[in-house]
Every structure is written in structure tokens, then in C-alpha cells.
From Swiss-Prot:
InterPro entries: UCP032146. Belongs to the UPF0262 family. It comes from Methylobacterium radiotolerans (strain ATCC 27329 / DSM 1819 / JCM 2831 / NBRC 15690 / NCIMB 10815 / 0-1). Disulfide bonds: none annotated. This is UPF0262 protein Mrad2831_3513.
Length: 160
């Protein structure tokens, strides 16, 4: 679990439900650690009508994405379940392009790596916009926070 304290409308703690994740390869574990660090360094996360800061546990429950939100003291605020259906295609495509990216780093030219990375960022942006739309009215978050959350959502799908 990662933890950090700052202003009220933010995530101060973020974790992935241990029952929902498999251990990834070293690249994946590194990406997961970076995503947890980055989201705590800078995020905007607000539940309308409820002041934070918040603690978030992401998980998978019956093939749905679970956002278990609590106060930093552990008092439950809400649990929101999202269908994974709108994310399935982008998760599949993102997984393929990440694999291509990691392979390209070892063998491709800088211009080829850059082209793959542009595609990866485009898919990441698409997924973060979908996430913002799916949470609209329940959780307000900025683009960068949505991107970082998608990285963690993607981490829930890594095969061990």
C-alpha cells in the first residue's frame, strides 16, 4: 500500500486488493510501483458532498471493477462497482501494445519505439476518458489521476 497526506480532495492512500492481483513480471511490478507512487504524489479525487482525503482500494469483484473508498482513518465512504465491459477492448489492446513496447526497447530504433509509445499513450488517454465518464457524478477526478488509475486497473489484469 502506498500512503501520503496532503489537501482534502485527494487520495491519501491507494492499494490494490491482494485477492484481485497476480504477481506480474519485473517490468509489470515496476510499473505498478511507479503508478502507486505517482498517484499519491499528484492527484485530484473528490466525492461530491463529501470532503476527503480518501483511501482507495481497487479490486475485482464478480468481474466488476471495485472502487472501495474510505476515509484515511478507515471509515467506509462508498463502494462503487463498474462494469469492465467498456474497458475490455482497450485493456486487451493496451496489453498488446505494452508487450510490443517492451520488446521494441530491446531491439527497435528510437523512432520505432517512439511510434509505439505514441500509440500506447493514445490508448491510455482513451481509457482514462472512459473511466472519467463512468465515474461522472460519483467521483470527480482530473485527467492525470484518471490515467494513473487506469494504470492500476490494468495492473489488476496482469497474468502472473
Amino acid at each position: 500500500m502506498a500512503e501520503k497526506q496532503r489537501g482534502p480532495n485527494r487520495l491519501a492512500k491507494v492499494s490494490l486488493d491482494e485477492a484481485s492481483i497476480a504477481r506480474g513480471n519485473p517490468d509489470q511490478e515496476h510499473e505498478r510501483a511507479i503508478a502507486l507512487f505517482d498517484i499519491l504524489e499528484d492527484n485530484s479525487f473528490t466525492i461530491p458532498g463529501r470532503e476527503g482525503p480518501y483511501a482507495l482500494t481497487l479490486g475485482l469483484v464478480e468481474n466488476k471493477l471495485s472502487f472501495a473508498i474510505a476515509t484515511v482513518d478507515g471509515e467506509p465512504v462508498m463502494t462503487h462497482l463498474l462494469s469492465l465491459t467498456p474497458f475490455r477492448r482497450v485493456i486487451r489492446d493496451y496489453e498488446m501494445i505494452c508487450e510490443s513496447y517492451y520488446n521494441a526497447i530491446r531491439t527497435a530504433s528510437p523512432s520505432q519505439i517512439e511510434a509505439i509509445d505514441m500509440g500506447r499513450r493514445g490508448l491510455h488517454n482513451e481509457a482514462s476518458e472512459t473511466l472519467k465518464q463512468r465515474l461522472e457524478g460519483k467521483v470527480d477526478l482530473d485527467h492525470d489521476t484518471a490515467r494513473r488509475l487506469f494504470t492500476l486497473i490494468f495492473a489488476l489484469h496482469w497474468k502472473g
